[in-house]
C-alpha cells in the first residue's frame, strides 16, 4: 500500500485502508476514525400537534460563562444583557409541550465542505437523529454546539473562546469515556470552536481540530477568487439518483443565522429540505443514543 501523505494520513479513509492492510489494529483504527466523526446542524425542534414543525438554530443569541464555570444564555429576541441560566432554559424547554429536543446530523470532518456537505440529500436523511437530553450537562452541550455553529463574527472574540474552552474542560473532566454521546458532543464542540477561531484569524487551541475544507477555504476564498475555486466549497446539482425520494418539502420552517460563520451550509436547500423531509416522514426518529452500542 502506498504510504499516506502528511495531508491525508489522518483521514477516515486512509485510517481504514491502513487497518485493512494490517498497518493498524482494528481497535486503534476504530478509535481514530471516531475522532473524525462529529455532529453538525444542531437545532431545536418544536411542533404542535400535526402542524408545521419549527427548526430553530438561533434560539441562543449569546453564550457566557459565569463565575463557577456556570453556563448562561441570552435568548433570541431578548436584550443583550438579559441572561438566563442554562438551568432555567432547560426547565423552560422541558415544560413546553411543543418542545421535541434537538436534531443533529452525523458527519465526518472531510464531509463538511464549508457552504455545502459532501453528503447528498438522500443520504443526509439517514444521518439525522433526535437528541432528547435528560441531564443538564447534555442539554448545555447541545445548546453550545448550536450556538457555536451560528456564532456571528461580532461575538467571535478571544475572551469568548477562552471561556468556552474552560467550560468544555470542566465538562470533559466530568465525562466518562463510556458516556459516548456526551463525548461525541464534546468532540463536536471542539471541532467547531477551533475551526471558528481559525476562520476569524485567532490561533486555534488545537490545530488538529480545524476542519480540513475550512482550512483550505480561508486561504483559497480570500481576495475575490475565480469561480472555479469558489465552486469547490458550494453545493452542486445532485444526481437524480441521490435526491429526496419525494417532492422536497417547504424549508422556510428552518431558522438559522445567515451571519453565522460555521453555519453557512444552512443556506443550501439541499441541507434544509432533507431535515424537514426526515422529520415529516412516518418512519420512527432514530435517537442519538442509538448511534452507539450499549455494553452493560
Curated annotation (Swiss-Prot):
Coiled coil: none annotated. Pfam families: Herpes_UL7. InterPro entries: Herpes_UL7. It is found in: Virion; Virion tegument; Host cytoplasm; Host Golgi apparatus. It comes from the Viruses. Its main location: virion. Keywords: Host cytoplasm, Host Golgi apparatus, Virion, Virion tegument. The keyword Ribosomal protein does not apply. GO terms for cellular component: host cell Golgi apparatus; viral tegument. Plays a critical role in cytoplasmic virus egress. Participates in the final step of tegumentation and envelope acquisition within the host cytoplasm. Interacts with UL51; this interaction allows incorporation of UL7 within the virion. Belongs to the herpesviridae cytoplasmic envelopment protein 1 family. This is Cytoplasmic envelopment protein 1. It comes from Human herpesvirus 1 (strain 17).
